[in-house]
């Protein structure tokens, strides 16, 4: 069954890409979409019937060279099953949605065949992503990692006639190569120290790696920390974390369904999946985990600030994605890998829905993407408005504080997963991450409601012809939105106990003794007061200190074999347990931030509409700083792009032009004609000239014989 899940999208890609002329373009759409829905249904069957123990499915032998013995296999555990349903569900719905969205694309003429190629690219991406998440060794994972990079390049640059789309595709490809270089170095380092790229061998070797020093770039590093950092650099590139994030907003040049599939729900979460998959290594690398926390927290804050002032509806959601990925990395770095996966799952539902909902708005407004030209659309496209409202309630974290049913808090999906991350950040003792994430939650609420108010409320702005002809999307586009809306509302409550409650150990097949059974409700933690929650004052001081609860290595708890379970939590890791005992003000803080963000968004865009303009004029430097995305693109142009172009130009003009071409052209146009002219003068045609030359030759030959001793 798992093999069918993996290979069905590949079959669809091959048929759609190469066989569409035989089965027609519509036939290719039917085949690719049908195979994706088959893969999706089987993925849910696997997820709901998954046995406790990890399964290893051998497909074929792959690479055998010296100590490297690599097979192609499938690692099936709870982590894999979660990613299977995320990837295949979103991909299947995006395929269905694209039937309507790509039906009449203005970037192509009526006679151009583009749909089969687009659907083939989508299916190929899905196969590469499935190869990544099912891999049983790091080389296979790297091939899937690079496969999604290639598919992303093809899909971002799908409108290859647009220079901006080509530039965005190249930018995404190049920036990701920086992160991939770190990932490759991490794989090589692990193979160098363990003689294996098999995950179970690496996991079993993690305690020894924590005791090993590795010489790298003229310095000595702890091997576990160094290798975990290198792997995380790869995750930073793929998941668009700070410094390697610049490709993600530009990737919105691709078709909107691509944004929903790749840049919201699947490819960008590969980095989070990598950190969670390698949790047995990260648990022995406290400095690397601290780096993950700080990078994630700063990214969440940075992207939220930029999202405050963006005007392109897709770019607002893109920066929202970047920010939410930061939340996931904070959870993973804090050691609560199940919570990171919880937010990954819920985020996939509401972010894919927001992107597809934005696509419905763009479709209604005849491909207008500037929110300043929207307004009053809730009456024109009521179903899309309802969908976008649900997505906004989910991403901003709307719920009922301190109210639960059966131990499950009541709220939209983002309320449960995002609040779990913020509470875990506080419980880990990292005050910096806690306060930064709360601030980011407030800004998330502001820009999300700003999008709603600018798009659906107020008077119509911009081209009145577009407003007059705005219409609801076809049913084939609205049906996927409705299904995603169900997940955006219910996913958090349905799986709360499994990811953050009293079923974590059984759900992820963790030995209870390794970390203590997580207590999923406040009632279950009565009588247990974690150190970080003894008093509100003590908790506040601990948070401000910014010390990590997991800062001490866990090497003393070494195990001789690969740890049991889809994720690994060391015995010293009690963060998920302590998170349920944090003070009430900590639990209320993200809700307060959400309400504050909503209030200011209403004030700026409903209550006092001239206020945004007055604020921008009063703070022009800050406004331009945020509008220009902290000037990261300009900084990278100054430090890397322009020097690289200058060096390339010098090598082209001076190296290729002057040296290589100069040598060849100089030989062809200079020396050869010179010797030709000399030879031409010698060939005079007079007999006595040739006789004189022969005499000179004989004299020279005799002189050489005498000087060298003749025959001796």
Curated annotation (Swiss-Prot):
It comes from the Bacteria. Its EC number is 7.1.1.-. One of its GO terms (biological process) is electron transport coupled proton transport. Disulfide bonds: none annotated. GO terms for cellular component: plasma membrane-derived chromatophore membrane. It catalyses: a quinone + NADH + 5 H(+)(in) = a quinol + NAD(+) + 4 H(+)(out). It is an enzyme of class 7 (translocase). InterPro entries: NADHpl_OxRdtase_5_subgr, ND/Mrp_TM, NU5C-like, Proton_antipo_N. It is found in: Cellular chromatophore membrane. Keywords: Membrane, NAD, Quinone, Translocase, Transmembrane, Transmembrane helix, Ubiquinone. GO terms for molecular function: NADH dehydrogenase (ubiquinone) activity; quinone binding. It is a multi-pass membrane protein. The chain crosses the membrane at residues 4-24, 28-48, 79-99, 113-133, 138-158, 183-203, 216-236, 256-276, 290-310, 325-345, 346-366, 385-405, 421-441, 475-495, 588-608, 655-675, 686-706. Disruption phenotype: No functional NADH-quinone oxidoreductase complex. Cells lacking this gene have a nearly normal respiratory growth phenotype on lactate, however they are unable to perform anaerobic photosynthesis. It is suggested that in R.capsulatus this complex may function in reverse flow under physiological conditions. NDH-1 shuttles electrons from NADH, via FMN and iron-sulfur (Fe-S) centers, to quinones in the respiratory chain. The immediate electron acceptor for the enzyme in this species is believed to be ubiquinone. Couples the redox reaction to proton translocation (for every two electrons transferred, four hydrogen ions are translocated across the cytoplasmic membrane), and thus conserves the redox energy in a proton gradient. Belongs to the complex I subunit 5 family. NDH-1 is composed of 14 different subunits. Subunits NuoA, H, J, K, L, M, N constitute the membrane sector of the complex. NCBIfam families: NDH_I_L, PRK06590.1. This is NADH-quinone oxidoreductase subunit L. It comes from Rhodobacter capsulatus (Rhodopseudomonas capsulata). The gene is nuoL.
């Amino acid at each position: 069954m798992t093999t069918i899940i993996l290979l069905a999208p590949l079959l669809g890609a091959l048929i759609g890409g190469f066989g569409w002329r035989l089965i027609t373009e519509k036939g290719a759409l039917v085949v690719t979409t049908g195979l994706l829905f088959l893969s999706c249904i089987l993925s849910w069957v696997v997820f709901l019937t998954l046995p406790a123990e990890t399964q290893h499915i051998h497909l074929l032998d792959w690479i055998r060279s010296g100590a490297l013995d690599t097979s192609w296999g499938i690692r099936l555990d709870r982590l894999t099953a979660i990613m299977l349903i995320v990837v295949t569900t979103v991909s299947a719905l995006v395929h269905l949605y694209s039937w309507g969205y790509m039906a009449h694309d203005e970037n192509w003429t009526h006679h151009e065949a583009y749909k089969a190629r687009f659907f083939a690219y989508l299916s190929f991406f899905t196969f590469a992503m499935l190869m990544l998440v099912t891999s049983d060794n790091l080389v296979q994972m790297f091939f899937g990692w690079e496969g999604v990079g290639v598919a992303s390049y093809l899909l971002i640059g799908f409108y290859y006639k647009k220079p901006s789309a080509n530039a965005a595709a190249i930018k995404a490809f190049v920036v990701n190569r920086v992160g991939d270089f770190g990932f490759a170095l991490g794989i090589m380092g692990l193979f160098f120290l363990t003689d294996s790229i098999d995950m179970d061998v690496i996991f079993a070797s993690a305690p020894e790696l924590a005791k090993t020093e590795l010489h790298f770039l003229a310095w000595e590093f702890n091997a576990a920390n160094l290798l975990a950092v290198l792997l995380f650099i790869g995750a930073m590139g793929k998941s668009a974390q700070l410094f390697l994030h610049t490709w993600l907003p530009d990737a919105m040049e691709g078709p909107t369904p691509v944004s929903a599939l790749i840049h919201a729900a699947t490819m960008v979460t590969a980095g989070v999946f990598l950190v969670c998959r390698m949790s047995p290594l990260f648990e022995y690398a406290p400095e690397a985990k601290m780096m993950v926390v700080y990078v994630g927290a700063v990214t969440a804050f940075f992207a939220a600030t930029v999202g405050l002032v963006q005007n392109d509806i897709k770019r607002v959601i893109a920066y929202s994605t970047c920010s939410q990925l930061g939340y996931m990395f904070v959870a993973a770095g804090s050691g609560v890998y199940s919570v990171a996966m919880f937010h990954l799952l819920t985020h996939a539902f509401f972010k894919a829905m927001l992107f597809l909902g934005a696509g419905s708005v763009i479709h209604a407004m005849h491909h207008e993407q500037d929110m300043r030209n929207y307004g009053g659309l809730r009456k024109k496209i009521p179903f899309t408005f309802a969908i976008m409202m649900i997505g906004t309630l989910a991403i901003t974290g709307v719920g009922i504080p301190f109210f639960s049913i059966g131990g499950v808090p009541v709220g939209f999906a983002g309320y449960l997963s995002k609040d779990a991350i913020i509470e875990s950040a506080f419980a880990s003792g990292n005050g910096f991450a806690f306060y930064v994430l709360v601030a980011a939650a407030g800004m998330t609420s502001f820009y999300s409601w700003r999008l709603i108010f600018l798009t659906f409320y107020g008077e119509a702005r911009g081209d009145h012809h577009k407003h007059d002809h705005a219409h609801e999307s076809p049913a084939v586009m609205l049906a996927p939105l409705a299904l995603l809306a169900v997940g955006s509302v219910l996913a958090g409550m349905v799986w709360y106990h499994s990811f953050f409650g009293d079923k974590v150990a059984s759900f992820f097949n963790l030995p209870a003794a390794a970390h203590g059974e997580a207590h999923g409700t406040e009632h279950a933690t009565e009588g247990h007061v974690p150190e970080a929650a003894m008093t509100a004052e003590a908790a506040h001081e601990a948070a401000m200190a910014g010390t990590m609860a997991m800062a001490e290595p866990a090497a003393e708890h070494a195990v001789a074999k690969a740890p049991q379970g889809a994720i690994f939590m060391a015995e010293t890791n009690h963060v998920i347990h302590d998170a349920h005992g944090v003070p009430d003000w900590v639990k209320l803080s993200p809700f307060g931030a959400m309400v504050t963000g909503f209030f200011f968004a209403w004030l700026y865009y409903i209550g006092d509409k001239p206020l945004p303009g007055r604020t921008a004029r009063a703070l022009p430097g800050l406004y331009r700083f945020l509008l220009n995305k902290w000037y990261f693109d300009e900084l990278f142009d100054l430090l890397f792009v322009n020097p690289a172009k200058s060096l390339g130009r010098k090598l082209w003009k001076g190296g290729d032009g002057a040296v290589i071409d100069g040598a060849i052209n100089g030989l062809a146009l200079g020396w050869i004609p010179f010797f030709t002219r000399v030879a031409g003068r010698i060939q005079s045609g007079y007999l006595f000239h040739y006789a004189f030359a022969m005499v000179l030759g004989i004299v020279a030959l005799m002189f050489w014989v005498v000087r060298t001793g003749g025959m001796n």
